Amino acid sequence: MPQYFAIIGKKDNPVYEIEFTNAENPQGFPQDLKELNPFILHASLDIVEDLQWQINPTSQLNGNGGNGSNGGGGFLRSRAVNNTDNCYLGKVDHFYGLAITAYISYSGMKFVMIHGNSANSSVVIDDNNMRSFYQEVHELYVKTLMNPFYKITDPIRSPAFDSRVRTLARKHLSK
């Protein structure tokens, strides 16, 4: 099952892009779909930004504090019960059998992935593995931000970053 992953900046600029393939499908997405992937991903950003500002219904019901319980706007809507997981938005969109998942940082960086399928069946996403993948890639991104020679708007071209993201994909996405 191929996946196309991107980190999108605050101004909807791509900061990092990569396609993951597996042994079953080493070519990844078909060529015509490879060209459409950035457009599909950017089309889903509107949904991600809408979800970003929705009030978290669990914090409103449970009175867990935060913006949701006092009637103000919430920062991140999530299916998560605790506040540590509320950056992971889960499946936010679909496009002709492709699922799109998202994670958004508190600084407004969007981590978005298109999940392809190897057959004409619907894509099944393991939320726990996806959440772990996004959280670990976010940690790598934060470490990249700590580099004094990196500007937040520049694309990430580090081979070390790329290698670590590929390792995380093998660890979390190939299950």
Curated annotation (Swiss-Prot):
Q: Supply one GO CC term from the record.
A: TRAPPI protein complex
Is the keyword DNA-binding in the record?
A: no
Subcellular location(s): the record lists:
Golgi apparatus, cis-Golgi network; Endoplasmic reticulum; Preautophagosomal structure
Q: Which domain of life is it from?
A: Eukaryota
Q: Which InterPro entries match?
A: Longin-like_dom_sf, Sedlin
Q: By its UniProt entry, which CDD domains does this protein fall under?
A: TRAPPC2_sedlin (cd14825)
Q: What keywords sit in the KW lines?
A: Autophagy, Endoplasmic reticulum, ER-Golgi transport, Golgi apparatus, Transport
Family designation: Belongs to the TRAPP small subunits family. Sedlin subfamily.
Question: What is its quaternary makeup?
Answer: Part of the multisubunit TRAPP (transport protein particle) I complex composed of BET3, BET5, TRS20, TRS23, TRS31 and TRS33. Part of the multisubunit TRAPP (transport protein particle) II complex composed of BET3, BET5, TRS20, TRS23, TRS31, TRS33, TRS65, TRS85, TRS120 and TRS130. Part of the multisubunit TRAPP (transport protein particle) III complex composed of BET3, BET5, TRS20, TRS23, TRS31, TRS33 and TRS85.
UniProt cross-references to PANTHER family, sorted A to Z: TRAFFICKING PROTEIN PARTICLE COMPLEX SUBUNIT 2
User: What is known about what this protein does?
Assistant: Component of the TRAPP I, TRAPP II and TRAPP III complexes which act as guanine nucleotide exchange factors (GEF) for YPT1. TRAPP I plays a key role in the late stages of endoplasmic reticulum to Golgi traffic. TRAPP II plays a role in intra-Golgi transport. TRAPP III plays a role in autophagosome formation.
| Protein name stated in the entry | Trafficking protein particle complex subunit 20
